[in-house]
Amino acid sequence: MARSGLEPQTVTDATPLLGRSLPELQDWVVAQGQPSYRAKQLYQWLYERSIHNLAEISVFPKAWRQSLQAVPVGRSQIVDRSVSPSGTIKYLLRLHDGEIIEAVGIPSGDRLTVCVSSQLGCAMACDFCATGKGGFRRHLAPHEIIDQVLTVQEDWQQRVSNIVFMGMGEPLLNLDAVLAAIRCLNQDIGIGQRGITVSTVGIPGHIRRLAETKRVGDRPLQFTLAVSLHAPNQAIRDRLIPSSRHYPITDLLQECRDYVQITGRRVTFEYILLAGLNDQPEQAEQLAQLLRGFQSHVNLIPYNPIDEVEYQRPSKARVDAFADALRQQRVAVTVRWSKGLGADAACGQLRANRSTATLPA
C-alpha cells in the first residue's frame, strides 16, 4: 500500500536525549515537526519520570511515539547489585556498547549519596586502587554519568541529595563531559552544586583550568574539589600515584591555592591511611606543614583492602592518633570509615566485576 505522506517517519538519532537542556530539546522537537510545547513534556518525562524509552511517554501522540522507538534516551541496564551490611549498594551497569561500569548508592539517614564513575577504567594506576589495575578503556559521555544518578534514584525511590565523582576514572581527564553532566544534574534534575564533589589525583594545569571555568552552565561554580593527596611528601606519593612523578607535590599545592583564590572555595584533601607507610606521627607533622595556612579540609580514609596488593589498614588507635596530631596543628580533619566494604564498593575497590552478594534485578 502506498503511503499517504501523513504517517510519521521513523526517527533515528544516534545522540541520546539524556543530558540535553530544555532549549536543546525544544530545537529537537521542532525539528521533528512537533509543536514546541512537546519539549516541556519530554523534559519532564526524561528528568522527573526517568524513562528508558520514548515510547513510554503516554502524552505523546501514539503514531509519533511509535516513530521514536529507535531514538536512544541514554539509559543503562542494571546487571547486578551487591549490598554491604551498612546498606550501601553497588550497581553494575551495562552501557549501550556492552561495557560495564559501577555506581554506588550510599544512604545516610534521610540522605542518599551516589558515587559515580567518569571513565571506563582509569589510567592513573594508583598502587592501592582496584580500578587502576584494569587500565583505561574510554571516557564516559555526559548521559552515561547522568544515568548513574537517575538509576540509583529510581532504584531507591528516593531523591539523591549528594553526588561524589569518586568512582571509576579520573574526572579532570574527562572534564568537558563531567561539567556537562554537572550542569544537567544541577539545573535539570535539581541537585545543588554544593552537594556535588569532584575528586582528582591532580593533573598538571587541570585544576587551574577548572578554577578558570568559573561557571557551570549559567551558574557560578560551587561544587567541592577533592584532591587525592595520600602522602605527606613526594617520595611516598610517587610510590602510590605513579603519575605524580612528573608533577611535584609543591606544584600541585600551588595550583590548589590558586583554585581557592580564584573560586573562594576551599579544597578537600583525601588521604588514605596505609599501615606502616603514611600513618606515622612524623608523617602527620609533615602533612600539617604542607597544609599550613591553607583553606582546606582533610578526609582521612582508612585503607580498604583489595586482593592485588599487600597494603594493610591501620588500627583504629593509629587512625585516631593521626587525626589528633593533625587537629593539634589546627588542620580541619574528618575520619571517613567506608560503608561499602561488604559489597566491594568502598573507596579504591571499584573495578566493574560481578559480586557474589546480589539482589534480584
Swiss-Prot record:
Record-level GO BP terms: rRNA base methylation; tRNA methylation
Ligand binding ([4Fe-4S] cluster): 122, 126, 129
The UniProt record gives the binding positions of S-adenosyl-L-methionine as 169-170, 199, 228-230, 304
Q: Which CDD domains match?
A: Radical_SAM
Q: Name one Pfam family in it.
A: RlmN_N
Per the entry, the cofactor note is:
Binds 1 [4Fe-4S] cluster. The cluster is coordinated with 3 cysteines and an exchangeable S-adenosyl-L-methionine.
Superkingdom as given in the UniProt entry: Bacteria
Q: Where is the Radical SAM core domain?
A: 108-344
Needs which cofactor? [4Fe-4S] cluster
Q: Name one GO cellular component term.
A: cytoplasm
Active site per UniProt: 102 (proton acceptor), 347 (s-methylcysteine intermediate)
- E.C. number, please? 2.1.1.192
Primary localization: cytoplasm
Q: Which PROSITE patterns match?
A: RADICAL_SAM (PS51918)
Q: What are the subcellular locations of this protein?
A: Cytoplasm
Catalytic reactions of this protein: adenosine(2503) in 23S rRNA + 2 reduced [2Fe-2S]-[ferredoxin] + 2 S-adenosyl-L-methionine = 2-methyladenosine(2503) in 23S rRNA + 5'-deoxyadenosine + L-methionine + 2 oxidized [2Fe-2S]-[ferredoxin] + S-adenosyl-L-homocysteine; adenosine(37) in tRNA + 2 reduced [2Fe-2S]-[ferredoxin] + 2 S-adenosyl-L-methionine = 2-methyladenosine(37) in tRNA + 5'-deoxyadenosine + L-methionine + 2 oxidized [2Fe-2S]-[ferredoxin] + S-adenosyl-L-homocysteine
Q: Which UniProt keywords apply?
A: 4Fe-4S, Cytoplasm, Disulfide bond, Iron, Iron-sulfur, Metal-binding, Methyltransferase, rRNA processing, S-adenosyl-L-methionine, Transferase, tRNA processing
Q: Which InterPro entries match?
A: Aldolase_TIM (IPR013785), Methyltransferase_A (IPR040072), RlmN_N (IPR048641), RNA_MTrfase_RlmN (IPR027492), rRNA_lsu_MTrfase_RlmN/Cfr (IPR004383), rSAM (IPR007197)
Cysteine pairings via disulfide bonds: 115-347
**Further notes on this entry?**
Reaction proceeds by a ping-pong mechanism involving intermediate methylation of a conserved cysteine residue.
Alphabetized NCBIfam families for the sequence: rRNA_mod_RlmN
Q: What does this protein do?
A: Specifically methylates position 2 of adenine 2503 in 23S rRNA and position 2 of adenine 37 in tRNAs.
What name does the UniProt record give this protein?
Probable dual-specificity RNA methyltransferase RlmN
What organism is this sequence from? Synechococcus elongatus (strain ATCC 33912 / PCC 7942 / FACHB-805) (Anacystis nidulans R2)
